[in-house]
Amino acid sequence: MNNTPIGNRKSIVLVGNRNAGKSTIFNKLLGFDRSIVSSVAGTTTDPVWKASEMIGYGAVRIVDTAGLDDIGKLGAQRVAKSEEEMRDSDLLIYIFNIEDLVNIEEEIIRKKIKDIKNKYKDKEFIFIANKIDLLDEKILDDIKLRYKDFIFISTKSKENAWLENLNNKIIEKLKNTEEEKSLLEGMLSYGDTALLVVPIDSEAPKGRLILPQVQIIRACLDEGIKVIVCRDSELEETLKENKNIDLVITDSKVFDKVADIVPESISLTSFSILFAREKGDIEEFLKGARYLERLKDGDKVLIAESCTHTVSHEDIGQVLIPNLIRKKTGKKIEFEFVYGKSLPDDLERFSMIIQCGGCMMTRNNMMNRVYAAREHNLAITNYGVTLAYLKGVFDRAVY
């Protein structure tokens, strides 16, 4: 369960004002206390998340966030972190303290709901009125008539019927979300054979495969596709021994070497390109790679990785790609590096973004980066497409 990659989990994000009961509901959904719960407003500062298995649906990621009405300079930073999680979500659960529904005019509440739905148009929503134990029955009945689209709960209730109702609603909403494209869609089908080329160099972890390789192997097994794995040093021999290869999938670092060995009759792609197809906009990435030729002296290129790792002399992002770009263009290009979920606020400083394969990212994470690039009129591509272009196999590879 907990080994399902974060990038393959649907993201459920709990939002609302401070002291609306987000953390209590978060803990109830998980079945144990993960977030600190307090009557003091602003207890949750940074987003808190936990991977979980939702019975009846599957692997999810549930996120508790700071209040959207947090105040002060630090409060503004907390709200920004909450909004980052909201952008990356599949389902937003907006929690109101029911006293707000009593004390604030319905027109204002409805405008708030309309505004947030307009801001996050591609998300599913659930609206909750919490702390119904604070109201007498007559006032509660009136509020329920006015807000029929809400789920009304009290987390203090000894009966957890509300929790079952909420779980069912979450599953219903998640089933409405976009299904991610299969990693191998349009590339391979049942009964085909894939040959995976996995170089073992200083960056290869000892005793295990890296996540993209594992995910591709699993995708092949799920779809009844036979898998052969070899190192680049044994590729020629492996091809001679196996005459029915339908697709070769290689690590991008050895794209050119592999392209020289694999016959033109066999399709060739990379692990990173397959993730670009699944997670992002492959046409945008292809267009972005062509922009490399237009880079000028002094241009800044942002290289974005979704996770952190120690850097070796063979590192793709920090060493290989910058060196190849300088060699290809002959220009004095400046490179900056960013890790994790956030991009810099001042993207206008850059000429283009080169994104990692994104095996740890959801499609929402990746597409938010594509949207940010478009908003700032920047080219964007990913490691695999970039290396195909720089190593002279751009037209040979399949996308």
Where are these regions (language model features)?
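Conserved C-terminal guanine-recognition region of P-loop GTPase G domains, centered on the G4
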Residues: 51-58, 74-151, 182-186, 209-228, ...
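Conserved beta-strand elements of the Class I
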Residues: 13, 94, 193-195, 300-302, ...
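Canonical P-loop GTPase G-domain recognition
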Residues: 123-126, 131-186, 193-195, 224-226, ...
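C-terminal effector/interaction modules appended to NTPase cores
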Residues: 17-23, 207-399
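Long, well-ordered amphipathic alpha-helical subdomains in the mid-to-C-terminal portions
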Residues: 187-213
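Short, flexible loop segments at the rims of nucleotide/cofactor-binding pockets, characterized by
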Residues: 39, 68-74, 98-105, 173-175, ...
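Conserved G1/Walker A P-loop phosphate-binding module
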Residues: 1-76, 80, 84-86
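G-domain G4 guanine-recognition motif of GTPases
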Residues: 65, 95-100, 125-139, 152-161, ...
